[in-house]
Every structure is written in C-alpha cells, then in structure tokens.
Amino acid sequence: MNKKNQWIVGINAVVSSIENDAEHVCEVLVEAGSKNSRLLDIEENARRKGIEVRRVTTQALDGVGGGVRHQGVAARYAAVRLWEEHDLKDLVDAAGGQALLLVLDGVQDPHNLGACLRSAAAAGVTAVIIPKDKSVGINATVRKTSSGAADRLPVIAVVNLARSLRELQKQDVWIYGLEGEAETSLYALDLRGKVALVLGGEADGLRRLTREHCDVLARIPMPGEVESLNVSVAAGVTLFEAVRQRTLV
C-alpha cells in the first residue's frame, strides 16, 4: 500500500478523525474569527492531543475542500490510504476465519458510498472492495459523508471485480449477492465465517459477471409497498444481519 496525504472537511468528519485516529491527523484548519462553539471544541481537542491548529481564511478552506461544504474546518490526514489489490489476500488471511467483506459493484453517488463506508466501519468489516471503473472513488464528499470512515477502512479499488471475487473464493470466502428478485431471503443465509456481501449500484444493480460469480443470491424481504431500498440502507441492513449472527451466544 502507498501513503498519501488527504484533506478531510466538515465538522463530523474532523471530529471523528481526531477522536478515533488522532495519530494520523497532521494539522487542523479552523476558520479565522469563527465563534462557533463546535469549532472551538474541535480546536481545543486537537491541541490537547498535540495536533497543530491553524486559523485560516474561508478562501483557504474552500481551496482544500474541493468544493465540498467544509463548515469552517478541515484536517490534513496523513495515513496509509491507498490499498492495492494484492493487499486483499493478506487482509483476509489476517482476519482468520471471520473475514467480512463489503463489495460495492458500481455505486456512483458519493453520498451513498460514504454512507456505505460509515456502516461498514461500524460493522467492523475487513475491507471494502469497489471497481475502478463505473464507480465513484474516494473523494472529499465521500470522506465527509462517511464521517472519516473512508480514511480508516481498507478500501480497495480493483480493475476486474469478477476476477477479485474468484480470488476470494480460492480463499474459501463465500460470496453472497443481494438482488431484489432472488428467491432466497437474506435471513436464511449463514453469514458467519469468511463472507463477502455484494451489492449493486443505484441504477442497474449487480452487473451480469458479478452476479454470475456469486455463490448465492438473496433478497431483503420487504412486506411494504416499496420495491427497493437505497444501496446504503441495504448495505446497513445486510451488514448488521451478519453482525447479529456473529455475535449470537
């Protein structure tokens, strides 16, 4: 994996980074002249943890935010970020028999990806896998929406998703794809052990090759009149069903 500095913007994202991963926060920028109590708390907390804090202009924050609403604060984050495809095998091996992977096939809305990553971090996933093509990458909007999870999770962008699924199967990882028309219920699956949960993009769902490489296709039962869930909601439901099963005594 490679190291690269990144900027995180927005109150929640910066707070989360300082509280959960302070050693990788290099500096915090706070809007000069602001009396916002939440910004003052961030400044105090950062200084208490030995993080450099600078008061800067709104224009400076606009520059590092890349057009994302920064709410008067940004943090420069110098952590290990760029995971490579070849890291995936080691991550699965390190998780032993409890690897839990989230695979997102073509999620293009950065808010959806950010929300998925936030749920994935809360569920303790081993890694998140996304395709390099036809998918939004990790950008400032994703970081903000994920409340910092995008910079703490191994997120691996792969060239060939079908090939990556085959490699996971060689490591005895079960591949479960979520599809609305599937006959099997999510709640009938055994999600313990080595598992990859695969969800499709907002428009087209799972691509054909992705679907064909799943061991089982399942659906989330919905007794109401709505036919589908937002991908980030579906990811949360699916991940925490896995968490529930894994934590049953």
UniProtKB/Swiss-Prot annotation:
Top-level EC class as recorded in UniProt: transferase
Cystine pairs: none
InterPro entries with a match to the protein in the record: 23S_rRNA_MeTrfase_RlmB, Alpha/beta_knot_MTases, Ribosomal_eL30-like_sf, rRNA_MeTrfase_TrmH, SpoU_MeTrfase, SpoU_subst-bd, tRNA_m1G_MTases_N
SMART domains in the record: SpoU_sub_bind
Residue positions binding S-adenosyl-L-methionine: 200, 220, 229
Family affiliation: Belongs to the class IV-like SAM-binding methyltransferase superfamily. RNA methyltransferase TrmH family. RlmB subfamily.
General function of this protein: Specifically methylates the ribose of guanosine 2251 in 23S rRNA.
Protein's name according to its UniProt entry: 23S rRNA (guanosine-2'-O-)-methyltransferase RlmB
Organism this protein belongs to: Xylella fastidiosa (strain 9a5c)
Gene this chain is encoded by: rlmB
